[in-house]
Protein backbone atom coordinates (compact mmCIF):
# COMPACT_ATOMS: atom_id res chain seq x y z
CA UNK A 1 0.00 0.00 0.00
CA UNK A 2 1.48 3.37 -0.95
CA UNK A 3 2.42 5.56 1.98
CA UNK A 4 0.00 8.24 0.73
CA UNK A 5 -3.05 5.98 1.14
CA UNK A 6 -4.97 5.38 4.36
CA UNK A 7 -6.53 2.05 5.26
CA UNK A 8 -10.26 2.09 4.46
CA UNK A 9 -12.97 0.90 6.88
CA UNK A 10 -13.98 -2.81 6.62
CA UNK A 11 -16.84 -3.61 4.25
CA UNK A 12 -19.55 -5.90 5.70
CA UNK A 13 -21.55 -6.60 2.54
CA UNK A 14 -20.69 -10.29 2.66
CA UNK A 15 -22.65 -10.69 5.97
CA UNK A 16 -26.36 -11.57 5.90
CA UNK A 17 -28.96 -9.20 7.36
CA UNK A 18 -29.68 -11.74 10.15
CA UNK A 19 -26.05 -11.79 11.23
CA UNK A 20 -25.89 -8.01 11.19
CA UNK A 21 -29.04 -7.85 13.34
CA UNK A 22 -27.49 -10.22 15.91
CA UNK A 23 -24.32 -8.16 15.99
CA UNK A 24 -26.27 -4.98 16.66
CA UNK A 25 -28.23 -6.56 19.51
CA UNK A 26 -25.10 -8.12 21.07
CA UNK A 27 -21.99 -6.00 20.33
CA UNK A 28 -19.70 -8.57 21.94
CA UNK A 29 -20.29 -10.80 18.95
CA UNK A 30 -18.26 -8.28 16.93
CA UNK A 31 -15.16 -9.98 18.27
CA UNK A 32 -15.89 -13.14 16.33
CA UNK A 33 -16.08 -11.67 12.82
CA UNK A 34 -13.21 -9.32 13.57
CA UNK A 35 -11.06 -12.25 14.64
CA UNK A 36 -12.13 -14.13 11.55
CA UNK A 37 -11.26 -11.16 9.37
CA UNK A 38 -7.85 -10.90 11.01
CA UNK A 39 -7.10 -14.56 10.38
CA UNK A 40 -8.34 -14.30 6.81
CA UNK A 41 -6.13 -11.33 6.09
CA UNK A 42 -3.12 -13.25 7.39
CA UNK A 43 -3.93 -16.26 5.27
CA UNK A 44 -4.81 -14.22 2.19
CA UNK A 45 -2.99 -10.90 2.41
CA UNK A 46 -4.17 -8.17 0.09
CA UNK A 47 -1.76 -7.47 -2.72
CA UNK A 48 -0.10 -4.17 -1.88
CA UNK A 49 2.08 -1.95 -4.04
CA UNK A 50 5.72 -2.37 -3.09
CA UNK A 51 6.99 0.70 -1.27
CA UNK A 52 8.96 2.79 -3.74
CA UNK A 53 12.58 3.41 -2.80
CA UNK A 54 13.94 6.76 -1.77
CA UNK A 55 16.93 8.01 -3.74
CA UNK A 56 19.94 9.96 -2.49
CA UNK A 57 22.30 10.90 -5.28
CA UNK A 58 25.62 11.93 -3.74
CA UNK A 59 28.02 13.67 -6.08
CA UNK A 60 31.29 15.46 -5.44
CA UNK A 61 33.29 17.69 -7.76
CA UNK A 62 36.58 16.35 -9.17
CA UNK A 63 36.85 13.37 -6.82
CA UNK A 64 38.70 10.45 -8.36
CA UNK A 65 39.05 6.75 -7.66
CA UNK A 66 42.74 7.12 -6.78
CA UNK A 67 41.59 8.96 -3.64
CA UNK A 68 39.16 6.27 -2.43
CA UNK A 69 40.30 3.34 -0.35
CA UNK A 70 37.47 1.13 -1.63
CA UNK A 71 39.10 1.38 -5.08
CA UNK A 72 42.45 0.29 -3.68
CA UNK A 73 43.91 3.78 -3.48
CA UNK A 74 46.85 4.17 -1.10
CA UNK A 75 46.59 7.93 -0.60
CA UNK A 76 43.78 8.19 1.94
CA UNK A 77 41.27 6.13 3.92
CA UNK A 78 37.60 6.82 3.14
CA UNK A 79 35.68 4.57 5.58
CA UNK A 80 32.21 5.93 4.88
CA UNK A 81 32.58 5.65 1.12
CA UNK A 82 33.97 2.18 1.75
CA UNK A 83 30.83 1.35 3.72
CA UNK A 84 28.64 2.12 0.71
CA UNK A 85 30.82 -0.08 -1.49
CA UNK A 86 31.12 -2.91 1.04
CA UNK A 87 27.39 -2.97 1.71
CA UNK A 88 26.57 -2.53 -1.97
CA UNK A 89 28.40 -2.57 -5.29
CA UNK A 90 31.49 -0.94 -6.79
CA UNK A 91 31.62 -0.23 -10.53
CA UNK A 92 35.16 -0.46 -11.90
CA UNK A 93 34.41 0.77 -15.43
CA UNK A 94 32.16 3.80 -15.07
CA UNK A 95 33.00 6.66 -17.43
CA UNK A 96 32.11 10.32 -17.86
CA UNK A 97 30.95 11.14 -21.38
CA UNK A 98 32.30 14.72 -21.24
CA UNK A 99 34.68 15.21 -18.32
CA UNK A 100 33.85 18.73 -17.27
CA UNK A 101 31.65 19.89 -14.41
CA UNK A 102 28.66 21.54 -16.09
CA UNK A 103 28.43 19.22 -19.10
CA UNK A 104 28.68 16.14 -16.88
CA UNK A 105 25.83 17.38 -14.70
CA UNK A 106 23.66 18.07 -17.73
CA UNK A 107 24.32 14.57 -19.05
CA UNK A 108 23.36 13.08 -15.68
CA UNK A 109 20.13 15.08 -15.38
CA UNK A 110 18.93 14.28 -18.89
CA UNK A 111 20.42 10.86 -19.57
CA UNK A 112 21.60 12.32 -22.88
CA UNK A 113 24.98 13.19 -24.37
CA UNK A 114 26.14 16.81 -24.60
CA UNK A 115 25.31 17.17 -28.29
CA UNK A 116 21.70 16.23 -27.46
CA UNK A 117 21.12 18.18 -24.23
CA UNK A 118 22.86 21.31 -25.56
CA UNK A 119 25.31 21.85 -22.68
CA UNK A 120 28.65 21.11 -24.32
CA UNK A 121 31.02 23.28 -22.25
CA UNK A 122 31.20 25.36 -19.09
CA UNK A 123 30.21 28.44 -21.06
CA UNK A 124 26.81 26.93 -21.80
CA UNK A 125 23.55 27.63 -19.99
CA UNK A 126 21.37 24.63 -19.22
CA UNK A 127 17.94 24.67 -20.83
CA UNK A 128 15.85 23.77 -17.80
CA UNK A 129 12.70 23.35 -19.87
CA UNK A 130 13.91 20.02 -21.19
CA UNK A 131 13.10 16.63 -19.71
CA UNK A 132 15.13 15.57 -16.65
CA UNK A 133 14.85 12.63 -14.30
CA UNK A 134 13.95 14.83 -11.25
CA UNK A 135 11.00 16.26 -13.21
CA UNK A 136 9.79 12.77 -14.09
CA UNK A 137 10.15 11.57 -10.51
CA UNK A 138 8.34 14.65 -9.22
CA UNK A 139 5.49 14.01 -11.63
CA UNK A 140 5.35 10.43 -10.37
CA UNK A 141 4.83 11.53 -6.77
CA UNK A 142 8.38 11.86 -5.45
CA UNK A 143 9.36 14.80 -3.28
CA UNK A 144 12.52 16.16 -4.89
CA UNK A 145 15.36 18.32 -3.61
CA UNK A 146 18.61 19.72 -5.00
CA UNK A 147 21.20 20.75 -2.41
CA UNK A 148 24.76 21.94 -3.02
CA UNK A 149 26.60 22.51 -6.27
CA UNK A 150 24.38 23.00 -9.33
CA UNK A 151 26.71 24.84 -11.75
CA UNK A 152 24.31 24.92 -14.70
CA UNK A 153 23.73 28.71 -14.79
CA UNK A 154 19.95 28.39 -14.72
CA UNK A 155 17.27 28.05 -12.07
CA UNK A 156 16.74 24.42 -11.04
CA UNK A 157 13.49 22.93 -12.29
CA UNK A 158 11.76 19.76 -11.16
CA UNK A 159 12.53 20.24 -7.46
CA UNK A 160 10.18 20.89 -4.56
CA UNK A 161 13.11 22.44 -2.72
CA UNK A 162 16.52 23.64 -3.85
CA UNK A 163 19.46 25.35 -2.22
CA UNK A 164 22.46 25.77 -4.50
CA UNK A 165 25.89 27.37 -4.24
CA UNK A 166 25.86 30.73 -6.01
CA UNK A 167 29.29 32.31 -5.50
CA UNK A 168 32.03 32.26 -8.17
CA UNK A 169 29.56 31.65 -11.01
CA UNK A 170 27.89 28.82 -9.07
CA UNK A 171 31.23 27.20 -8.26
CA UNK A 172 30.72 28.25 -4.66
CA UNK A 173 33.06 29.13 -1.81
CA UNK A 174 34.48 26.80 0.81
CA UNK A 175 34.04 29.32 3.65
CA UNK A 176 30.83 31.21 4.51
CA UNK A 177 29.35 30.31 1.11
CA UNK A 178 26.56 32.12 -0.71
CA UNK A 179 23.47 30.09 -1.57
CA UNK A 180 20.54 30.66 -3.86
CA UNK A 181 17.68 28.95 -2.04
CA UNK A 182 14.20 28.65 -3.51
CA UNK A 183 14.73 31.96 -5.30
CA UNK A 184 16.38 33.86 -2.42
CA UNK A 185 20.06 34.71 -1.89
CA UNK A 186 21.48 33.90 1.54
CA UNK A 187 24.92 33.56 3.14
CA UNK A 188 25.60 30.63 5.45
CA UNK A 189 28.31 30.74 8.11
CA UNK A 190 30.68 27.80 8.26
CA UNK A 191 32.38 25.31 5.96
CA UNK A 192 30.58 24.39 2.74
CA UNK A 193 30.89 20.60 3.02
CA UNK A 194 29.35 20.66 6.51
CA UNK A 195 26.68 23.20 5.57
CA UNK A 196 25.49 21.20 2.56
CA UNK A 197 25.04 18.18 4.82
CA UNK A 198 23.17 20.28 7.40
CA UNK A 199 20.82 21.39 4.65
CA UNK A 200 20.36 17.82 3.43
CA UNK A 201 19.46 16.55 6.90
CA UNK A 202 17.12 19.51 7.40
CA UNK A 203 15.30 18.58 4.19
CA UNK A 204 14.96 14.98 5.35
CA UNK A 205 13.66 16.06 8.76
CA UNK A 206 11.00 18.30 7.24
CA UNK A 207 10.02 16.27 4.19
CA UNK A 208 6.54 14.95 3.49
CA UNK A 209 6.73 11.55 5.21
CA UNK A 210 3.94 10.23 2.99
CA UNK A 211 6.03 10.51 -0.16
CA UNK A 212 9.21 8.83 -1.34
CA UNK A 213 12.00 11.34 -1.85
CA UNK A 214 14.80 11.95 -4.29
CA UNK A 215 17.55 14.20 -2.98
CA UNK A 216 20.52 15.36 -5.01
CA UNK A 217 23.29 15.95 -2.47
CA UNK A 218 26.14 17.64 -4.34
CA UNK A 219 29.36 18.78 -2.70
CA UNK A 220 31.77 21.43 -3.97
CA UNK A 221 34.79 19.57 -2.62
CA UNK A 222 37.35 18.50 -3.63
CA UNK A 223 37.35 21.13 -6.39
CA UNK A 224 40.23 23.55 -6.90
CA UNK A 225 41.53 25.52 -4.94
CA UNK A 226 41.26 22.76 -2.31
CA UNK A 227 40.60 24.64 0.95
CA UNK A 228 40.39 22.23 3.91
CA UNK A 229 37.93 22.50 6.79
CA UNK A 230 39.28 24.27 9.90
CA UNK A 231 39.59 20.91 11.70
CA UNK A 232 41.74 19.56 8.86
CA UNK A 233 44.10 22.49 8.29
CA UNK A 234 47.65 21.16 8.38
CA UNK A 235 46.53 17.59 9.02
CA UNK A 236 48.85 16.19 6.32
CA UNK A 237 51.74 18.64 6.80
CA UNK A 238 54.12 15.85 7.77
CA UNK A 239 52.76 13.20 5.40
CA UNK A 240 54.73 12.20 2.30
CA UNK A 241 52.40 10.81 -0.35
CA UNK A 242 53.58 8.28 -2.96
CA UNK A 243 54.21 9.78 -6.38
CA UNK A 244 52.56 8.36 -9.49
CA UNK A 245 54.95 6.45 -11.74
CA UNK A 246 54.51 8.97 -14.58
CA UNK A 247 54.72 12.20 -12.58
CA UNK A 248 57.66 13.23 -14.80
CA UNK A 249 56.07 12.19 -18.09
CA UNK A 250 57.89 13.69 -21.11
CA UNK A 251 54.99 12.84 -23.49
CA UNK A 252 57.17 10.87 -25.87
CA UNK A 253 55.00 8.40 -27.73
CA UNK A 254 52.01 10.76 -27.65
CA UNK A 255 50.92 13.58 -29.93
CA UNK A 256 50.52 17.35 -29.68
CA UNK A 257 47.46 17.21 -27.41
CA UNK A 258 49.41 15.86 -24.44
CA UNK A 259 52.39 18.14 -25.06
CA UNK A 260 50.44 21.37 -25.58
CA UNK A 261 48.07 21.21 -22.60
CA UNK A 262 48.27 23.81 -19.84
CA UNK A 263 47.44 21.84 -16.71
CA UNK A 264 50.79 20.73 -15.36
CA UNK A 265 51.86 20.74 -11.75
CA UNK A 266 55.18 22.20 -12.87
CA UNK A 267 53.90 25.21 -14.81
CA UNK A 268 50.16 25.72 -14.20
CA UNK A 269 49.69 25.44 -10.43
CA UNK A 270 49.79 29.01 -9.14
CA UNK A 271 51.78 30.06 -6.08
CA UNK A 272 48.90 32.05 -4.59
CA UNK A 273 45.55 30.49 -5.52
CA UNK A 274 46.67 26.85 -5.64
CA UNK A 275 49.74 26.52 -3.43
CA UNK A 276 48.70 29.29 -0.99
CA UNK A 277 52.21 30.73 -0.66
CA UNK A 278 51.15 34.14 0.65
CA UNK A 279 51.20 35.41 4.22
CA UNK A 280 48.33 37.44 5.64
CA UNK A 281 50.44 40.59 5.46
CA UNK A 282 51.14 40.01 1.75
CA UNK A 283 47.47 39.46 0.99
CA UNK A 284 46.50 42.64 2.82
CA UNK A 285 49.01 44.63 0.75
CA UNK A 286 47.15 43.61 -2.40
CA UNK A 287 43.53 42.91 -1.59
CA UNK A 288 42.78 42.28 -5.28
CA UNK A 289 44.69 39.01 -4.91
CA UNK A 290 42.45 36.07 -5.67
CA UNK A 291 43.46 34.11 -2.59
CA UNK A 292 42.49 37.05 -0.40
CA UNK A 293 39.00 37.02 -1.94
CA UNK A 294 38.34 33.68 -0.24
CA UNK A 295 40.61 34.15 2.78
CA UNK A 296 38.63 37.20 3.90
CA UNK A 297 35.47 35.08 4.16
CA UNK A 298 36.96 33.15 7.10
CA UNK A 299 36.32 34.15 10.72
CA UNK A 300 39.42 35.61 12.38
CA UNK A 301 40.04 32.50 14.48
CA UNK A 302 40.06 30.36 11.32
CA UNK A 303 42.43 32.83 9.63
CA UNK A 304 44.79 32.37 12.58
CA UNK A 305 44.66 28.61 12.19
CA UNK A 306 45.15 28.94 8.43
CA UNK A 307 48.23 31.15 8.90
CA UNK A 308 49.75 28.63 11.28
CA UNK A 309 49.03 25.67 8.99
CA UNK A 310 50.65 27.26 5.92
CA UNK A 311 53.61 28.97 7.61
CA UNK A 312 55.81 25.88 7.28
CA UNK A 313 55.00 25.55 3.57
CA UNK A 314 55.78 29.20 2.86
CA UNK A 315 59.08 28.97 4.74
CA UNK A 316 60.15 25.83 2.85
CA UNK A 317 59.43 27.42 -0.51
CA UNK A 318 61.25 30.64 0.28
CA UNK A 319 64.49 28.91 1.11
CA UNK A 320 64.91 28.96 -2.67
CA UNK A 321 66.71 25.66 -3.03
CA UNK A 322 63.95 23.78 -4.89
CA UNK A 323 64.56 23.29 -8.61
CA UNK A 324 63.68 20.92 -11.45
CA UNK A 325 62.19 17.59 -10.44
CA UNK A 326 62.63 18.40 -6.76
CA UNK A 327 60.35 21.44 -7.17
CA UNK A 328 57.76 19.38 -9.06
CA UNK A 329 57.79 16.76 -6.29
CA UNK A 330 57.42 19.46 -3.65
CA UNK A 331 54.48 21.06 -5.45
CA UNK A 332 52.88 17.65 -5.86
CA UNK A 333 53.05 17.07 -2.09
CA UNK A 334 51.38 20.42 -1.33
CA UNK A 335 48.68 19.72 -3.90
CA UNK A 336 47.98 16.30 -2.37
CA UNK A 337 47.92 17.65 1.18
CA UNK A 338 45.19 20.16 0.36
CA UNK A 339 43.18 18.02 -2.07
CA UNK A 340 43.06 15.01 0.24
CA UNK A 341 42.22 17.14 3.29
CA UNK A 342 39.06 18.31 1.53
CA UNK A 343 38.19 14.67 0.80
CA UNK A 344 38.34 13.93 4.54
CA UNK A 345 35.46 16.32 5.16
CA UNK A 346 33.44 14.79 2.33
CA UNK A 347 33.83 11.31 3.78
CA UNK A 348 32.96 12.46 7.31
CA UNK A 349 29.78 14.08 6.05
CA UNK A 350 28.75 11.01 4.09
CA UNK A 351 29.00 9.21 7.42
CA UNK A 352 26.73 11.82 9.02
CA UNK A 353 24.12 11.29 6.33
CA UNK A 354 24.27 7.49 6.51
CA UNK A 355 23.94 7.59 10.29
CA UNK A 356 20.94 9.90 10.06
CA UNK A 357 19.19 7.63 7.56
CA UNK A 358 19.84 4.69 9.87
CA UNK A 359 18.46 6.64 12.83
CA UNK A 360 15.15 7.41 11.08
CA UNK A 361 14.80 3.89 9.69
CA UNK A 362 15.17 4.80 6.02
CA UNK A 363 18.67 3.51 5.26
CA UNK A 364 17.69 0.19 3.72
CA UNK A 365 14.79 1.67 1.75
CA UNK A 366 17.02 4.28 0.13
CA UNK A 367 19.09 3.84 -3.01
CA UNK A 368 22.36 5.56 -2.12
CA UNK A 369 24.60 6.45 -5.04
CA UNK A 370 28.03 8.01 -4.67
CA UNK A 371 29.91 9.38 -7.66
CA UNK A 372 31.79 12.43 -8.92
CA UNK A 373 31.21 14.57 -12.00
CA UNK A 374 34.32 12.94 -13.51
CA UNK A 375 37.72 11.70 -12.42
CA UNK A 376 40.80 13.86 -11.86
CA UNK A 377 44.54 13.75 -12.35
CA UNK A 378 46.51 13.43 -9.13
CA UNK A 379 49.93 13.93 -10.67
CA UNK A 380 49.59 11.29 -13.39
CA UNK A 381 51.33 12.58 -16.55
CA UNK A 382 52.48 15.48 -14.35
CA UNK A 383 48.96 16.93 -14.33
CA UNK A 384 46.09 18.14 -12.21
CA UNK A 385 42.56 18.89 -13.53
CA UNK A 386 40.44 16.78 -15.91
CA UNK A 387 39.06 17.19 -19.50
CA UNK A 388 41.14 14.51 -21.23
CA UNK A 389 39.80 11.11 -22.19
CA UNK A 390 42.78 9.53 -20.46
CA UNK A 391 41.81 7.05 -17.77
CA UNK A 392 42.30 8.97 -14.51
CA UNK A 393 39.94 11.63 -15.81
CA UNK A 394 37.40 9.73 -17.91
CA UNK A 395 36.91 7.03 -15.28
CA UNK A 396 34.67 8.10 -12.43
CA UNK A 397 33.77 6.51 -9.11
CA UNK A 398 30.42 4.76 -8.82
CA UNK A 399 29.32 2.91 -5.71
CA UNK A 400 25.70 2.08 -4.88
CA UNK A 401 23.99 0.73 -1.77
CA UNK A 402 20.47 -0.72 -1.85
CA UNK A 403 20.21 -4.05 -0.02
CA UNK A 404 16.77 -4.85 -1.44
CA UNK A 405 18.33 -5.32 -4.88
CA UNK A 406 22.12 -5.35 -4.49
CA UNK A 407 24.20 -8.09 -2.92
CA UNK A 408 26.69 -6.65 -0.45
CA UNK A 409 30.28 -6.66 -1.62
CA UNK A 410 29.48 -6.93 -5.32
CA UNK A 411 31.75 -5.49 -8.00
CA UNK A 412 31.02 -4.91 -11.66
CA UNK A 413 33.21 -4.58 -14.73
CA UNK A 414 30.23 -3.64 -16.91
CA UNK A 415 30.96 -0.56 -19.01
CA UNK A 416 28.74 2.15 -17.60
CA UNK A 417 28.43 5.88 -18.23
CA UNK A 418 26.99 8.82 -16.35
CA UNK A 419 24.10 9.00 -18.84
CA UNK A 420 23.00 5.69 -17.27
CA UNK A 421 22.11 7.24 -13.93
CA UNK A 422 18.82 8.85 -15.01
CA UNK A 423 17.25 5.69 -16.49
CA UNK A 424 18.45 3.69 -13.47
CA UNK A 425 16.66 5.99 -11.02
CA UNK A 426 13.50 5.98 -13.12
CA UNK A 427 13.58 2.20 -13.49
CA UNK A 428 13.83 1.57 -9.74
CA UNK A 429 11.09 4.14 -9.08
CA UNK A 430 8.73 2.33 -11.44
CA UNK A 431 8.63 5.27 -13.85
CA UNK A 432 8.66 4.53 -17.57
CA UNK A 433 12.00 5.45 -19.11
CA UNK A 434 11.41 7.81 -22.08
CA UNK A 435 12.57 6.40 -25.40
CA UNK A 436 14.81 9.40 -26.15
CA UNK A 437 17.04 8.82 -23.10
CA UNK A 438 20.38 7.60 -24.44
CA UNK A 439 21.70 5.89 -21.32
CA UNK A 440 20.77 2.40 -20.17
CA UNK A 441 19.33 1.37 -16.81
CA UNK A 442 21.88 -0.34 -14.59
CA UNK A 443 19.13 -2.27 -12.80
CA UNK A 444 19.87 -5.57 -14.62
CA UNK A 445 23.51 -5.28 -13.54
CA UNK A 446 22.67 -4.34 -9.96
CA UNK A 447 20.20 -7.16 -9.49
CA UNK A 448 22.60 -9.76 -10.88
CA UNK A 449 25.56 -9.21 -8.53
CA UNK A 450 27.27 -6.90 -11.02
CA UNK A 451 27.43 -9.38 -13.88
CA UNK A 452 27.41 -7.88 -17.37
CA UNK A 453 24.27 -8.78 -19.38
CA UNK A 454 24.91 -10.62 -22.63
CA UNK A 455 23.45 -7.79 -24.71
CA UNK A 456 25.29 -4.98 -22.90
CA UNK A 457 27.18 -2.22 -24.72
CA UNK A 458 30.71 -2.86 -25.98
CA UNK A 459 32.08 0.65 -25.52
CA UNK A 460 31.70 3.92 -23.64
CA UNK A 461 31.50 7.04 -25.83
CA UNK A 462 33.26 10.33 -25.04
CA UNK A 463 33.24 13.82 -26.58
CA UNK A 464 35.00 16.87 -25.13
CA UNK A 465 34.33 20.33 -26.63
CA UNK A 466 35.82 23.14 -24.51
CA UNK A 467 38.65 24.40 -26.72
CA UNK A 468 40.18 26.91 -27.22
CA UNK A 469 39.89 27.63 -23.53
CA UNK A 470 41.59 27.41 -20.16
CA UNK A 471 44.00 24.46 -19.87
CA UNK A 472 44.28 24.16 -23.68
CA UNK A 473 42.97 20.62 -23.95
CA UNK A 474 42.17 19.90 -27.59
CA UNK A 475 38.72 18.85 -28.69
CA UNK A 476 38.43 15.11 -28.97
CA UNK A 477 36.08 12.15 -29.06
CA UNK A 478 36.52 8.41 -28.82
CA UNK A 479 35.50 5.07 -27.37
CA UNK A 480 36.67 2.98 -24.45
CA UNK A 481 36.13 -0.80 -24.61
CA UNK A 482 37.12 -3.34 -21.97
CA UNK A 483 40.63 -3.64 -23.40
CA UNK A 484 41.30 -0.69 -25.73
CA UNK A 485 40.83 3.04 -26.13
CA UNK A 486 40.58 5.00 -29.39
CA UNK A 487 40.76 8.82 -29.41
CA UNK A 488 40.56 11.41 -32.19
CA UNK A 489 41.87 14.93 -31.44
CA UNK A 490 40.48 17.48 -33.89
CA UNK A 491 39.77 21.15 -34.62
CA UNK A 492 43.23 22.70 -35.05
CA UNK A 493 44.92 19.28 -35.21
CA UNK A 494 44.00 15.92 -36.71
CA UNK A 495 45.61 13.19 -34.62
CA UNK A 496 44.56 9.72 -33.53
CA UNK A 497 45.64 7.83 -30.44
CA UNK A 498 45.01 4.22 -29.48
CA UNK A 499 45.95 2.40 -26.29
CA UNK A 500 46.08 -1.22 -25.19
CA UNK A 501 44.64 -0.75 -21.70
CA UNK A 502 45.76 -4.16 -20.47
CA UNK A 503 49.37 -3.85 -21.62
CA UNK A 504 49.63 -0.08 -21.10
CA UNK A 505 47.17 1.02 -18.37
CA UNK A 506 48.99 4.34 -17.87
CA UNK A 507 48.49 5.24 -21.56
CA UNK A 508 52.11 6.03 -22.28
CA UNK A 509 52.49 4.48 -25.75
CA UNK A 510 50.23 5.40 -28.65
CA UNK A 511 49.79 2.30 -30.84
CA UNK A 512 47.64 3.90 -33.53
CA UNK A 513 49.12 3.02 -36.91
CA UNK A 514 51.27 0.18 -35.55
CA UNK A 515 51.21 -2.80 -37.92
CA UNK A 516 50.71 -5.38 -35.19
CA UNK A 517 47.49 -3.64 -34.11
CA UNK A 518 46.09 -3.04 -37.61
CA UNK A 519 43.24 -5.54 -37.26
CA UNK A 520 42.19 -4.24 -33.86
CA UNK A 521 42.44 -0.64 -35.08
CA UNK A 522 40.08 -1.40 -37.96
CA UNK A 523 37.62 -3.01 -35.54
CA UNK A 524 37.73 -0.01 -33.23
CA UNK A 525 37.26 2.47 -36.07
CA UNK A 526 34.18 0.55 -37.15
CA UNK A 527 32.87 0.39 -33.58
CA UNK A 528 33.43 4.14 -33.18
CA UNK A 529 31.39 4.82 -36.30
CA UNK A 530 28.59 2.55 -35.09
CA UNK A 531 28.63 4.15 -31.64
CA UNK A 532 28.41 7.68 -33.05
CA UNK A 533 25.51 6.62 -35.22
CA UNK A 534 23.77 5.00 -32.25
CA UNK A 535 24.08 8.16 -30.14
CA UNK A 536 23.37 10.52 -33.06
CA UNK A 537 26.68 12.37 -32.86
CA UNK A 538 26.48 12.93 -36.59
CA UNK A 539 28.98 15.75 -37.05
CA UNK A 540 31.74 15.15 -34.49
CA UNK A 541 34.45 16.94 -36.49
CA UNK A 542 32.80 20.36 -36.77
CA UNK A 543 35.51 23.01 -36.97
CA UNK A 544 34.23 25.90 -34.86
CA UNK A 545 37.30 27.81 -33.70
CA UNK A 546 35.76 30.74 -31.80
CA UNK A 547 34.09 29.31 -28.73
CA UNK A 548 34.51 31.54 -25.74
CA UNK A 549 33.16 35.07 -25.67
CA UNK A 550 32.30 37.26 -22.70
CA UNK A 551 33.62 37.40 -19.17
CA UNK A 552 31.97 34.20 -18.01
CA UNK A 553 33.62 32.15 -20.69
CA UNK A 554 37.02 33.44 -19.67
CA UNK A 555 36.58 32.58 -15.99
CA UNK A 556 39.16 30.27 -14.48
CA UNK A 557 38.62 27.55 -11.92
CA UNK A 558 35.77 25.64 -13.52
From Swiss-Prot:
Belongs to the sulfatase family. GO terms for molecular function: hydrolase activity. This is N-acetylglucosamine-6-O-sulfatase. It holds the Pfam family Phosphodiest. InterPro entries: Alkaline_phosphatase_core_sf (IPR017850), Phosphodiest/P_Trfase (IPR002591), SGSH_C (IPR032506), Sulfatase_CS (IPR024607). It comes from Bacteroides thetaiotaomicron (strain ATCC 29148 / DSM 2079 / JCM 5827 / CCUG 10774 / NCTC 10582 / VPI-5482 / E50). Its EC number is 3.1.6.-. It comes from the Bacteria. The conversion to 3-oxoalanine (also known as C-formylglycine, FGly), of a serine or cysteine residue in prokaryotes and of a cysteine residue in eukaryotes, is critical for catalytic activity.
Amino acid sequence: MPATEKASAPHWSFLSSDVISIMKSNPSTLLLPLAALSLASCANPQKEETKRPNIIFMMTDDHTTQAMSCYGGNLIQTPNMDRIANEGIRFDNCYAVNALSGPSRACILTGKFSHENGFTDNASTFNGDQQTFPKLLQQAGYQTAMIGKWHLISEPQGFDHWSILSGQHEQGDYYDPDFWEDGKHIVEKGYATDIITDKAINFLENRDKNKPFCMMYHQKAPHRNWMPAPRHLGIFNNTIFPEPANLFDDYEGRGKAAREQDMSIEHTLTNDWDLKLLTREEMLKDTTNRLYSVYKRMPSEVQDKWDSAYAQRIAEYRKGDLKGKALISWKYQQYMRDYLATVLAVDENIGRLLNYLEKIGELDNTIIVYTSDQGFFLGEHGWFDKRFMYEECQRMPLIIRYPKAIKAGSTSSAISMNVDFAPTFLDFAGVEVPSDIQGASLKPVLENEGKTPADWRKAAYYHYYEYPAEHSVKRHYGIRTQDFKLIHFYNDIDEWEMYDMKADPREMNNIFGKAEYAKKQKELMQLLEETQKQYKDNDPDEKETVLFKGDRRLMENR
